[in-house]
Amino acid sequence: MTSPITSTTVLPARREDISFTTSDGLTLVGEIAWPEEHPAVATALFLHPLPTAGGFMDSHIIRKASWRLPALADIAVFRFNFRGVTSPRGTSEGTFGEGLEEKHDLDAALSEAELRGLPAPWLIGWSFGTEVILKHARVHADRISGVILLSPPLHRTSPEEVASWSDAPIPVVALIPEFDDFLPPDPARAGFSPAPSIELVMAEGAKHLWVGETQTRFVLNEITKRLNPPAAPLPEAWSV
């Protein structure tokens, strides 16, 4: 017997609440969801949308990735709150750092993933989270397996910072919604032109927030294609 996977479906995983400390002394809170039946083949390390606009570790794409990818694709999901951000998991210490101080949060999360033996980490940012990656993660290219950018606005990222990724030794993929509020396809092509090696994937009919099951599945399938290709496309039902 199978049951359709919907926006509220929570599939089996081994879930662990975590906390870790940044180099400037703040304790951040998060969660790791591990596959329950098999070893993880890769890790999705998420950086969430803008805290001052309601972004947190439970922003819906990130939450649904945690609910689905461990069971459907043997992908571990690491999600956490940036400094000063509250979610049902708890509150990370500190205050919003305008995308600058969050460098320490990214560094600490990556170190925590390594400490816990999480395999093949991919940094996956959404909106503000993409800015933190583009600004601060290039120096970590030898520690990660790839980067996926969801709805990158390029508000805080300079052309020089984009260009620094042009020779990155890892795949970098940007998912660009057709009707994005901040960076639709044509401006995205121009904005990423300093780094032509970045793969731009245009998402037909999509918007910045990826609302609805069709857009959610598109994002999760694109993630799965990169992190565990044999598991794509993801099933839309679950055996119960």
Say what each PLM segment does:
Residues 155-156, 178-183, 208-209:
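Acidic catalytic loop of the alpha/beta-hydrolase fold
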Residues 1-39:
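N-terminal cap/lid segment of alpha/beta-hydrolase-fold proteins
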Residues 125-133:
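Gly/Ala-rich beta-loop-alpha elbow adjacent to hydrolase catalytic centers
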Residues 206-220:
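Catalytic histidine-centered segment of alpha/beta-hydrolase-like enzymes
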Residues 167-169, 174-176, 180:
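Short beta-strand/loop motif that positions the catalytic acidic residue
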Residues 160-162, 179-193, 215:
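Short alpha-helix in the alpha/beta-hydrolase fold that links the catalytic acid
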Residues 193-209:
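Catalytic histidine neighborhood in serine/cysteine hydrolases
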Residues 26-34, 39-118:
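Serine-hydrolase catalytic machinery in alpha/beta-hydrolase-like enzymes
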